[in-house]
Amino acid sequence: MPKLQLSELLSLTKVEQTLRLAEVNVELEKLTAQERVVWALENLEGNPALSSSFGIQAAVMLQLVTEVKSDTPIILTDTGYLFPETYQFIDQLTDRLNLNLHVFTADESPNWQEARYGKLWEQGVEGIEKYNKLNKVQPMRRALDQLEIGVWFSGLRREQSGSRANLPILSIQNGVFKFLPVLDWTNKEVHYFLKEYDLPYHPLWDQGYLSVGDTHTTQKWEPGMSEEETRFFGLKRECGLHEDDGELDGSGI
């Protein structure tokens, strides 16, 4: 597969761009996750970064990317409402993997947002979307801009939800390459990878959480619930980070 120039692809029509990326994705599907990471770092134009919510299986992507390029910027969009265990997990993995961590937050503090808008997460889908835009989307766009990122790695997996089932490994979003190396991994593959590298799950995994985000929009799994129903009161699966331009994302791993 030839090297891809972002500027060249952005100059194409949407149809031409889609067809070109589809050809590449056919080949990427044949590679292992490790091979995909190496290929992306060698063949995609622009500085790389990995976004991480430091969720249940976050250690997988952190290991995969940093073992190839140890100084890759790790971007965390911190809402200020993460679980205490998440902040401890961030410290643990940052120390264990010597992460080049960059933390971005909303322009308004959590208290300021509540004073202005009330508790947005209690205001239905519209409120949740506004909350996500303020605390996830805008800080992430600022991160990509300030760090001059051209290749954005994320740990989304098709198995996690219906909204992710048809995502490609490589796409373009917000003017950068978006790359999902473990898109086709199963929970079993994730488990064995963590075991092989002696890496931990998020601490709340043992307490029955399948997905972890903010304290006020994360529920412990109960019998009969899907993973999607444990987030945002079942109203949404995605946190908004990559719903821009018709694409979907969320915490990933």
Swiss-Prot record:
Pfam families: PAPS_reduct. Its EC number is 1.8.4.8. The active site is at 239 (nucleophile). One of its GO terms (molecular function) is phosphoadenylyl-sulfate reductase (thioredoxin) activity. It is an enzyme of class 1 (oxidoreductase). The keyword RNA-binding does not apply. Keywords: Cytoplasm, Oxidoreductase. Pathway: Sulfur metabolism; hydrogen sulfide biosynthesis; sulfite from sulfate: step 3/3. It catalyses: [thioredoxin]-disulfide + sulfite + adenosine 3',5'-bisphosphate + 2 H(+) = [thioredoxin]-dithiol + 3'-phosphoadenylyl sulfate. It is found in: Cytoplasm. One of its GO terms (biological process) is hydrogen sulfide biosynthetic process. One of its GO terms (cellular component) is cytoplasm. InterPro entries: PAPS/APS_Rdtase, PAPS_reduct_dom, PAPS_reductase_CysH, Rossmann-like_a/b/a_fold. HAMAP family: CysH. NCBIfam families: cysH, PAPS_reductase, PRK02090.1. Belongs to the PAPS reductase family. CysH subfamily. Catalyzes the formation of sulfite from phosphoadenosine 5'-phosphosulfate (PAPS) using thioredoxin as an electron donor. This is Phosphoadenosine 5'-phosphosulfate reductase. It comes from Aliivibrio fischeri (strain ATCC 700601 / ES114). The lineage of its organism: Bacteria, Pseudomonadati, Pseudomonadota, Gammaproteobacteria, Vibrionales.
